[in-house]
A protein has these predicted regions:
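Structural preference for well-ordered, secondary-structure-rich domains
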Residues: 1-263
């Protein structure tokens, strides 16, 4: 699970990733964990958590493009004078993103890929040793809805200090604290708003692309709390979606509706 993935970090590193009530995944990593991004003119520092989140959002084409379109990152990577006035164009782009990815340590790279793999494990059905279905996967849950097994988000490999990370799906969520538009949307994952409210549906290639195209430069949530939110939402989706759909079908059936009205 997630705890095992993060166990590669020592106790001090874990302490820096910990906040009250959120284990090692918080909206901010505290106490000296920020580092300057090397090789750029703008004086940008990123926390350990932000660096990991940027890497996790680089693992597929749609999320990577939303990351590059992020207006807050473009503003952050704009060189400024001592008064805060812009003195040049934003440096945020492929080169700056690569500079951030090259800041990852070997442990970071291991953690990032293991998170991709863990998220991906929700795609297929899970069976016990006797071949009995334990949990339906997102692919077959979607197939029950549409009749067709959808393609999943395709992993986009990327490098960090010359080492290849295979990439994978990671939930694309936006920061309500940095955008009035996102705040008005009730801190809701844009993916879910666009695909009918089913968290698992966002892992399909079509719906994840819709979410990215609808980003409009919104600032991405660069916190590992996104991961825990995703696990909670998807496990709930896998457990209860079919029951909810079946109940809705019954209640909206005209014969049932008429019987209820006549009761």
């Amino acid at each position: 699970g997630v705890d095992k993935i993060f166990s590669v970090y020592n106790l001090d590193q874990r302490r820096r990733m910990r906040s009250a009530g959120s284990s090692w995944y918080s909206s901010n990593l505290a106490f000296g964990s920020a580092k300057k991004v090397p090789g750029i003119n703008s004086n940008v520092t990123l926390t350990h958590e932000e660096r990991l989140a940027i890497a996790l959002n680089s693992g597929n084409e749609s999320s990577r493009q939303a990351l590059l379109d992020d207006k807050q990152l473009k503003d952050l990577f704009t060189p400024r004078d001592s008064n805060g006035n812009a003195i040049g164009k934003s440096e945020w782009g492929d080169s700056a993103l690569q500079a951030v990815l090259d800041m990852l340590s070997a442990k970071d790279r291991q953690v990032v890929q293991e998170i991709f793999d863990l998220v991906d494990s929700f795609w297929e059905d899970v069976y016990d040793d006797n071949g009995n279905l334990v949990t339906i996967g997102i692919k077959n849950l979607e197939k029950q809805e549409s009749g067709l097994a959808p393609p999943k988000v395709k992993a986009l490999p990327f490098t960090s200090n010359g080492k290849v990370i295979k990439g994978g799906y990671y939930p694309l969520k936006y920061n309500p604290h940095a955008s009035e538009q996102v705040a008005r949307e009730g801190e809701m994952n844009i993916e879910n708003a666009l695909v009918g409210g089913y968290p698992g549906s966002a892992m399909t290639a079509h719906n994840h692309t819709i979410a990215r195209k609808g980003s409009g430069g919104r600032p991405i949530r660069l916190g590992l709390d996104v991961l825990m939110d995703h696990f909670e939402q998807v496990t709930h989706d896998l457990a209860f979606r079919q029951a909810v759909v079946n109940a809705d079908n019954i209640l909206t059936d005209s014969a049932v509706s008429d019987a209820i009205k006549d009761a």
